[in-house]
């Protein structure tokens, strides 16, 4: 089982997430017999520090989370406006997703791996399509509570997926201003993908979800244009509607 561990802190509580490849709790987890594979899911654990409580949430189905067949991981969790926001990051097609209905979700057959390879968090299996086929869009999932049921999914084509990347780390780039407006930043990490069809042509930028809204508004800022062509690794909310960005120093 290959796992990616995610962690988000909330005052005296902690949420941890595990992206797993064999989640029996996931509905319809078993793949077609010929693949001998299972669907990916995200297991959420709630830890309360002072009360010393640990609760395991139901496994969230990771496959086809966005309706394009790809599985996702979550880059950060944000509490704002009595909701929970997260940025689902498409990771490509698992062996299960690639084989589903004779390759229904495969846009680029040449990207499907013909043998096992890679190492550590970049390892892959034969039959897998590694990394997303949709680099020119970003998604946000909005949940009503910590049970992580029935999310509202919203999409924008103004930025690429919303997370910073450093090896196996997926950094949160979705933050709320003091007035509840949620700003979604993208460093356009997909620019460095090897395959041209997996590279984004969108610059690093930021979009916004107004407080209480369930869709993006018209706000957009081209961060690369303002920085002379540079992108960033991470970002944080500071105060009001001010944010701190850890910029790259070269193009």
Task: Locate each region found by the language model.
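C-terminal motif of bacterial Sec signal peptides marking the signal peptidase cleavage site
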Residues: 17-22
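Acidic/polar, low-complexity intrinsically disordered N-terminal segments immediately downstream
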Residues: 25-93, 145
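Repeated scaffold domains used in trafficking and secretory/extracellular systems
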Residues: 29, 36, 67-79, 163-174, ...
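Beta-propeller blade signature
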Residues: 48-55, 101-149, 198-214, 251
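Beta-propeller fold detector
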Residues: 50-69, 116-118, 124, 150-160, ...
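Short coil/turn segments that connect the beta-strands within blades of beta-propeller domains
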Residues: 81-82, 179-181, 240-242
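Loop-centered beta-sheet repeat module
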Residues: 134-209
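Long, well-ordered mid-to-C-terminal structural blocks that present hydrophobic/aromatic surfaces
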Residues: 184-251
């Amino acid at each position: 089982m290959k796992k990616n561990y995610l962690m988000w802190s909330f005052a005296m509580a902690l949420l941890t997430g595990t992206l797993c490849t064999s989640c029996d709790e996931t509905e319809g987890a078993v793949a077609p017999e010929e693949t001998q594979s299972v669907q990916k899911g995200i297991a959420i654990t709630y830890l309360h520090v002072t009360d010393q409580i640990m609760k395991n949430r139901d496994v969230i189905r990771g496959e086809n989370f966005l309706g394009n067949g790809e599985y996702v991981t979550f880059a950060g969790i944000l509490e704002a406006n009595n909701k929970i926001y997260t940025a689902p990051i498409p990771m490509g097609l698992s062996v299960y997703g690639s084989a589903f209905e004779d390759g229904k979700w495969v846009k680029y057959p040449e990207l499907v791996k013909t043998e096992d390879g890679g190492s550590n968090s970049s390892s892959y299996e034969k039959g897998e399509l590694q990394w997303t086929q949709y680099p020119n869009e970003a998604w946000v999932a909005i949940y009503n509570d910590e049970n992580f049921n029935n999310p509202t999914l919203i999409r924008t084509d103004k930025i690429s997926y919303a997370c910073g990347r450093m090896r196996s780390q997926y950094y949160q780039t979705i933050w709320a201003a003091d007035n509840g407006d949620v700003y979604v930043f993208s460093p356009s990490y997909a620019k460095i993908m090897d395959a041209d069809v997996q590279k984004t042509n969108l610059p690093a930028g930021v979009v916004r979800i107004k407080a209480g809204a369930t869709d993006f508004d018209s706000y957009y800022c081209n961060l690369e244009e303002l920085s002379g062509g540079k992108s960033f690794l991470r970002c944080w909310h500071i105060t009001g509607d001010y944010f701190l960005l850890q910029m790259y120093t070269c193009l």
